[in-house]
């Protein structure tokens, strides 16, 4: 959609002598006070000429630019609010905070809840990876991490705050009066914005080639068929670039110098790259507006312009600018890494962790291309020291940040050992596509740039997309939200049936200890029953649905409830059989299986206790990745970058039992969503993000508070005690804890005791002597194993000395029959094929192990063997084959002869 001219023809512009002009280059309309201006002052229509503009403001650091902006709007009636983390954990569909408006999506922008203040001002650290491949090349125009300073106003039908006129006036006053930019240099470029299903006209504020701000007027909803319908809630959504404000006031040759100051020189030194010539940098930066990173020709033209301007050889210009761009990339990426990890990201192969790992590996790749020996964590440490006052969380979580980065580097170095074999596999393809490279990166974590050199050795060429990392990030930056209907275990016809039913009154929230109740039947469908009220808890938040009985008061017939589910606010009781005696309008009595429910309550509450204990022991980066509460045990999946030590598990367990012994009150609370977020932070969403204006919190006194819709005990003492019975790494970056509490702990102790008694009987000792007896048995086994190894070595030596090869065309073929296990065979085969032109085959019935010397390939032999039927394969010089039928030595030798 293109807005009409009237959308932008503001009284403010007319009264203040702004003229509407059409840019001579891009043909876009813009507003300016300079009647002679022909261009919109945005790149690539002009060069960066802000260096030549006389700006009255003193040079501002990022910190000073941020404060100047926030104070300006505070003085003009805006409430300053704290920024949110760079991980958008209040959103189920988005992993990273990409703009300040994300702070208020979806619940404020949809009108579900009011904003924390109106109007408000915030400076929100944001991360966008769509431009990650362009960082450094454009001298700071593109960054992965930046601060979006913003003032927002939310205009309701019955409450107008301000709109276009005031927003444009604020921008003009800030840039001309507060920063001292000459009025004739300020331009407002007409544009259109769309995002997150909303749209509206916007104005881009440009000065001297730099876009300093975007003023969005969110006033339309984009419908499913692509039409635009007016919104009742009209939102002023502005975004001012804090780093660009610092850059335009400092007039440094790159934005990186304005953002990082002396850290720029420190990074060049630590990385081991000579600092770029200052004159070359200034000229290159001035012409950088001409660069369109998506068009490699513009990069080439830019460098030719620099070469011509300075009279320097083009190759020297390219080499120096390439090196500097790589250092700028590392500056940018290490700050992004620091912020991600400080806010709790754990690098992994999925979700937000995937995006964190992508940035880390790209930084490591760049260091490798620069042939630098510096450890990445050393550079991140410099960033922490530099930003610790601006972002206190980076200092608080310093140990975790550095530990996680070093561990990622060690993993990356191990992965790079695979490069030769991956390159060999790719080299066999007739064409290497972008999809192939993404597949290799996703499966093995190998950047294509590092495959390039290995593939060149094999005379294989491929085209590396300039935006490779952006392509990969785009595939992983969002998550699909499941609807309430997708999450529930009910058939489609049942879901359709309940759409007309009223919400169920949740008695389990009024009294979590209520065991029975009376209710009225609102719906009966097959074996599904819906009542006006219930104390049966429906499955949710990892807690299983209640079971029990529904009793027909007319006939006294009892129906077993085998599960309870919920769709939106309607609770469905699933019965073992169809309730033939129950009709809509009948009164029934419900009784829950209290013993089962009470076990679930204990396991649910102790899950909260253990999660907080894990954070205390392991660090604030720990986040709930999943949970399940059953009557038999509880299960909690947490994000963490390492396997837990025995000592860490013991500490978590000790803290949890201490909280139980302290008899702490457990209390549910209901709060306004925004109020809860501002008071407790987004960690309240550990167990999921509820979609309501008021949210239910569970507070364990002086220990933990988070959003939770489950049922809980009212005091930690009711849990009794807890024992962690299993800890395992279930996927990269996720650790699973399993535990038992209360009666389930007693059951576990009994079962364990029974196993000890049984084991003692098997080995003929008493339970108290079990450990010492097992040690003796293990020592005896070890002695026998050592003896077996000695015998095997004797047999192996004898075999190698006496085995005679078959000769085929100057090739030696060894055949071994019925020898030892597979690993032992493999070792003998390796020794036999240590010299060129040698093949060794071990035969055990119809199973074959085949090895060749390094100058031969095993695949041709395998191919010939499998012609007679069978399965198997291998790569390089080793293979395993299972034939459909057993073959004699002579038959195998004949097959080998054919393959040669």
Curated annotation (Swiss-Prot):
Coiled coil: none annotated. Its cofactor is Zn(2+). The keyword Zinc applies. Signal peptide: none annotated. One of its GO terms (molecular function) is zinc ion binding. One of its GO terms (cellular component) is cytoplasm. Pfam families: tRNA-synt_2c (PF01411), tRNA_SAD (PF07973). Its EC number is 6.1.1.7. It is found in: Cytoplasm. It is an enzyme of class 6 (ligase). Binds 1 zinc ion per subunit. HAMAP family: Ala_tRNA_synth_A. Consists of three domains; the N-terminal catalytic domain, the editing domain and the C-terminal C-Ala domain. The editing domain removes incorrectly charged amino acids, while the C-Ala domain, along with tRNA(Ala), serves as a bridge to cooperatively bring together the editing and aminoacylation centers thus stimulating deacylation of misacylated tRNAs. This is Alanine--tRNA ligase. It comes from Saccharolobus islandicus (strain Y.G.57.14 / Yellowstone #1).
């Amino acid at each position: 959609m293109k807005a009409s001219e009237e959308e932008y023809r503001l009284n403010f512009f007319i009264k203040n002598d702004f003229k509407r002009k059409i840019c001579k280059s891009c043909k876009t309309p813009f507003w300016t006070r300079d009647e002679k201006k022909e261009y919109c002052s945005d790149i690539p229509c002009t060069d960066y000429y802000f260096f030549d503009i006389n700006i009255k403001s003193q040079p501002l650091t990022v910190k000073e630019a941020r404060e100047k902006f926030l104070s300006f709007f505070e003085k003009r009636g805006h409430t300053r609010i704290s920024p949110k983390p760079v991980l958008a954990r209040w959103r189920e569909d988005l992993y990273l905070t990409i703009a300040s408006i994300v702070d208020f999506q979806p619940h404020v922008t949809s009108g579900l809840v009011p904003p924390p203040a109106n109007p408000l001002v915030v400076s929100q650290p944001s991360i966008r990876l769509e431009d990650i491949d362009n960082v450094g090349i454009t001298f700071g125009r593109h960054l992965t991490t930046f601060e979006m300073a913003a003032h927002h106003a939310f205009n309701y039908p019955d409450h107008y705050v301000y709109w276009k006129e005031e927003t444009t006036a604020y921008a003009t006053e800030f840039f001309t009066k507060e920063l001292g930019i000459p009025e004739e240099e300020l331009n407002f470029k007409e544009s259109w914005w769309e995002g997150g299903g909303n749209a509206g006209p916007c104005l881009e504020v440009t000065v001297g080639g730099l876009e300093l701000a975007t003023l969005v007027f969110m006033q339309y909803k984009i419908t499913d068929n692509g039409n635009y319908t007016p919104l009742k809630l009209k939102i002023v959504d502005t975004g001012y670039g804090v780093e660009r404000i610092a850059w335009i006031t400092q007039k440094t040759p790159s934005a990186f110098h304005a953002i990082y100051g002396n850290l720029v020189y420190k990074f060049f030194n630590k990385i081991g790259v000579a600092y770029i010539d200052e004159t070359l940098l200034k000229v290159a930066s001035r012409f950088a507006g001409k660069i369109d990173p998506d068009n490699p020709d513009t990069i080439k033209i830019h460098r030719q312009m620099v070469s011509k301007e300075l009279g320097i050889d083009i190759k020297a210009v390219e080499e120096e600018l390439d090196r500097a761009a790589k250092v700028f990339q590392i500056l940018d990426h290490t700050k992004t890494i620091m912020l991600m990890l400080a806010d709790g990201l754990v690098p992994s192969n999925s979700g937000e962790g995937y995006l964190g790992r992508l940035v880390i590996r790209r930084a490591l790749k760049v260091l490798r291309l620069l042939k630098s020996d510096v450890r990445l964590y050393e550079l991140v440490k410099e960033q922490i020291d530099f930003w610790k006052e601006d972002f206190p969380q980076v200092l608080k979580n310093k140990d975790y940040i550095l530990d996680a980065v070093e561990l990622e580097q060690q993993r990356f170095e191990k992965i790079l050992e695979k490069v030769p074999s991956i390159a060999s596999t790719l080299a066999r393809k007739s064409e290497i596509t972008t999809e192939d490279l993404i597949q290799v990166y996703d499966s093995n974590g190998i950047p294509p740039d590092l495959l390039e050199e290995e593939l060149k050795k094999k005379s294989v060429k491929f085209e590396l997309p300039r935006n490779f990392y952006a392509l990969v990030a785009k595939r992983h930056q969002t998550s699909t939200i499941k609807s309430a209907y997708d999450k529930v275990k009910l058939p489609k016809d049942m879901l359709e049936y309940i759409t007309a039913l009223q919400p169920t009154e949740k008695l389990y929230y009024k009294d979590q200890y209520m065991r029975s109740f009376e209710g009225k039947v609102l719906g009966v469908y097959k074996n599904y029953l819906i009542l006006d009220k219930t104390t049966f808890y429906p499955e949710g938040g990892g807690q299983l649905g209640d079971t029990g009985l529904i009793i027909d008061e007319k006939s006294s017939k009892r129906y077993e409830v085998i599960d309870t589910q919920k769709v939106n606010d309607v609770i469905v009781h699933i019965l073992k059989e169809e309730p033939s005696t129950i009709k809509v309008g009948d009164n029934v009595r419900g009784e829950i299986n209290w013993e089962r429910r009470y076990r679930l309550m204990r396991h649910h509450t102790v899950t909260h206790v253990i999660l907080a204990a894990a954070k205390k022991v392991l660090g604030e980066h720990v986040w709930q990745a999943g949970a399940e509460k059953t009557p038999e045990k509880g299960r909690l999946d947490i994000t963490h970058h390492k396997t837990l030590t025995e000592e860490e598990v013991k500490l978590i367990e000790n803290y949890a039992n201490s909280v139980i012994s302290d008899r702490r009150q457990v209390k549910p609370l209901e709060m306004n969503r925004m109020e809860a977020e501002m008071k407790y932070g987004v960690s309240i969403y550990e167990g999921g993000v509820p979609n309501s204006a008021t949210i239910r919190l569970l507070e364990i006194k002086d220990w933990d508070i988070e959003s939770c819709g489950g049922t809980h005990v009212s005091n930690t003492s009711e849990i009794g005690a807890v024992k962690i019975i299993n800890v395992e790494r279930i996927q990269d970056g996720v650790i699973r804890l399993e535990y038992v509490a209360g009666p389930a702990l007693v059951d576990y102790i009994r079962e364990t005791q029974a196993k000890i008694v049984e084991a003692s009987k098997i080995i003929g000792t008493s339970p108290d002597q079990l450990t010492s007896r097992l040690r003796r048995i293990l020592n005896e086994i070890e002695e026998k194993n050592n003896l077996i190894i000695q015998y095997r070595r004797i047999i192996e030596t004898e075999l190698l000395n006496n085995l005679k090869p078959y000769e085929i065309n100057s090739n030696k073929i060894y055949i071994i029959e019925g020898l030892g296990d597979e690993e032992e065979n493999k070792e003998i085969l390796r020794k036999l094929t240590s010299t060129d032109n040698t093949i060794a085959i071990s035969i055990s019935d119809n199973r074959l192990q085949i090895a060749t010397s390094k100058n031969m390939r095993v695949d041709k032999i395998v191919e010939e063997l499998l012609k007679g039927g069978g399965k198997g394969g291998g790569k390089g010089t080793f293979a395993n084959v299972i034939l459909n039928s057993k073959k004699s030595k002579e038959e195998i030798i004949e097959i080998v002869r054919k393959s040669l």
